[in-house]
């Protein structure tokens, strides 16, 4: 690794380190998604509710991610905003079968999307409509309407249906995120 | 040379001149991507350094820094991660939301990287609270029995810390801890044993079992054995009927192969309160062996222990004298000092001079701490061989002249004062040395103490006028505090020596021109008193001082000012009195003499504040006196009750401190019912305890009015009444809402005369006795059958009456067949009570007779008090 990786990073070809924040209501599947993104041998068998946050590292083809997996419970939501400032992307995970909390979800999502550290820096947001495998789950387009996202033009956001247990839809979402982040970082450089 | 070295040191410390703001500013680097591990490590060290130096960091700043630190988890650098753990531990106290790193730490603690695991456990336990602890409980249990000793140890030590805030949860880990005790690793075994003991500490039976069990199957770790010895010693001291096998275990440890264990066992045996010479002997022999060790630390420990027990077991220690003699010239001065002071305690009177000469040779080389040890040894020596004061006094004076810290000088001055008080022969020489000392003393506190002593003692010497020069010099030369004390001392001369009074008045007149208010005020007051007041007033106000408790005085004056009715003058008699005059310093017990364990008389103040908070008792006025805590139950009873009697001007409040030791019961509506078989006493208001959960101590109160018949003593039956609700022992949640009534008979409550009397010493008893007149004098003579000698009789009578002896009249010279003790005190309501009790032994049949005269300024009071003795 050593020599070649340093050589390739010299030419700007190596994997870049990026920080992302993973947020969302409790029990939406944040930790499970990140677990799914790790290489099979490093995955943990058991997922317990996160307290505070955990840093998870994984990589895609061209980026090496440090993901801050934030706790979703009410009392920890205030800690999310401390991490937007130092990150280059946000993943917002939601439970698409949870129709009851749609209004709360909308509030929390708006809080994230309109946070000054997000808006002013224009960092990309990827919304993952998780648990699509559950019967009766809302589709991505339904959720877009329910959350009023179609009225939301400013900022760079995209929505994807996923299933954290099987990994369906995750690859596509991560490709999108990588592309957005690369674009974002290039725009910052210039 | 020395300064050079110092310069290098300060130059070498990069952290020396850190500024809090700039460090916190630098801490922003934590937010950068990618993380520069080396730089962050350095910043973290700075951050931890300033916290360790005691710099206070505000909550917002700390929280900001903390969130920065949490971002460092993305780095995989091992040393940085370990610094992060340290920082988290330091910031845990000052920052908000530390709980958010719980999951990160849990991940590290269960991860594969052993380097992280131990440190993560320590940090995790520091930030967690009782609620959170349950979620990590599973991991903790695993960590305690982990194969890696560092991890196991850190989990156990963290659990010991957790015991303080969430003992209930830690108790559930007992099985794992037990397993860890059988670990092969010395440290793990030691820590596990400590935790196991703490888990069971409240249950004496379980502790006993623990000692029994582990004393049989030998522990590998010497640390653990030492700890077990300490637990065993505690068992022996606490138990009324100690198990002989426990002692056998400690004794067997004397033959352990580890030096540490041998020393610990020996120390434990010699420190036990009741041991026979044959039991002590092996331990002393073991210490003697330690004395010959090549290791200085072991020798030091052995000599120090011998020194400590020298007073308790002089004969046993004497057998080591030969070894101790060798140490006199030991190059380690600390060992030499301890050896000499031990010899001073055990040695014969004849060897004292030789030893003093030895010690004088190097006294300047040892540290102040050990000089204090020497001084204390001299003090106990002087009380043993009073005639030796001629050797000791010049020695002490020489030490007093040399340089030394405040504590050291204080110890010397206290020793000289003690010698003067105990030995009248040494008085003149001692006072002369002290006078010389205050001529050149830089410690105001000591000067004022010496001046106070001079004012009290010097007028009684054959030539009082010679001291006045020293005192007046203080008025001219010293700081305000000392000047004021000197003025008071002068006034005391004037009050006691009538022939010196005119010259004192002249000196006091000069003091009127002093630059400070306090000094002028005192001078004016004393001058007025000395020129115009009667002899009795002079005695009361110059010699006796104000004997009230400062906080009581403050409260009474505040009440008076609040009441707003200034038609009646403020009555000083309602102020609670204390035994010690305002100006009297507390006596320090010399450290090397065996300390006596005596039940401490509670201070009035904490209780007074408690009582004042209860509206039912607010009208009673200030507390006159609070008794000691009296147990009304056996200490191992299901419910323990301690009683404290608070006396007010016209009533008594009994405070019952109840403790519930049943973990499956919740007590409701707890109260104590009192019943007087004679029907004289009646209970007034009571305050009950609404809820008394397991393990907590709460107080119930009952008001007793003093009966109209004038009785001030009696005994009342007491019954604890309460409702029981069964609860689940582990959670404390009630099983059901059902309750049932229950009663529990307590021991009888005795009310005595001494509850109504507060002992207050008069500094000149004779004049106070004269001043009271003969209107209310009662006399009584009777035989004492329960006591066998005069000192016991004197002690008993002062206990019964609640009066305190004056003018050291409680000290009975040996071999006398007759002795008179002067007692004085204040009856509730502020009436003076004085008493002269003459005790005599009948030489024929050794029976003891006592004649007691009681005087008061109120005849009724004299009647009441005399009734207590009859």
UniProtKB/Swiss-Prot annotation, chain A:
Q: One GO biological process from the UniProt record?
A: cilium assembly
Residues where lipid is bound covalently (N-myristoyl glycine): 2
**GO CC entries:** axoneme; cytoplasm; cytosol; dendrite
Q: Where in the cell is it found?
A: Cytoplasm
Tell me if Ligase is a UniProt keyword of this record.
no
Tissue and organ distribution: Specifically expressed in ciliated cells.
Alphabetically list the UniProt keywords: Cytoplasm, GTP-binding, Lipoprotein, Myristate, Nucleotide-binding
Residues binding GTP, per UniProt:
24-31, 69-73, 130-133
**What CDD domains does the annotation carry?**
Arl6 (cd04157)
Is the keyword Ribonucleoprotein in the record? Answer: no
Q: Name one Pfam family in it.
A: Arf
Q: Which GO terms describe its molecular function?
A: GTP binding; GTPase activity
Q: Which family does it belong to?
A: Belongs to the small GTPase superfamily. Arf family.
* Name of this protein: ADP-ribosylation factor-like protein 6
What organism is listed for this UniProt entry? Caenorhabditis elegans
From Swiss-Prot, chain B:
Summarize the subunit comment. Answer: Oligomeric complex that consists of at least the alpha, beta, beta', gamma, delta, epsilon and zeta subunits.
Q: What is this protein called?
A: Probable coatomer subunit gamma
Highest taxon of the lineage: Eukaryota
Tell me the organism's taxonomic lineage.
Answer: Eukaryota, Metazoa, Ecdysozoa, Nematoda, Chromadorea
For this UniProt entry, the molecular function terms from Gene Ontology, in alphabetical order, are: structural molecule activity
InterPro entries in the cross-refs: ARM-like, ARM-type_fold, Clathrin/coatomer_adapt-like_N, Clathrin_app_Ig-like_sf, Coatomer/calthrin_app_sub_C, Coatomer_g_Cpla, Coatomer_gsu, Coatomer_gsu_app_Ig-like_dom
The job of this chain, per UniProt, is described as: The coatomer is a cytosolic protein complex that binds to dilysine motifs and reversibly associates with Golgi non-clathrin-coated vesicles, which further mediate biosynthetic protein transport from the ER, via the Golgi up to the trans Golgi network. Coatomer complex is required for budding from Golgi membranes, and is essential for the retrograde Golgi-to-ER transport of dilysine-tagged proteins.
- Membrane topology type, per the record? Peripheral membrane protein
Q: Which GO terms describe its biological process?
A: endoplasmic reticulum to Golgi vesicle-mediated transport; intra-Golgi vesicle-mediated transport; intracellular protein transport; organelle transport along microtubule; protein secretion
The family classification in the record reads:
Belongs to the COPG family.
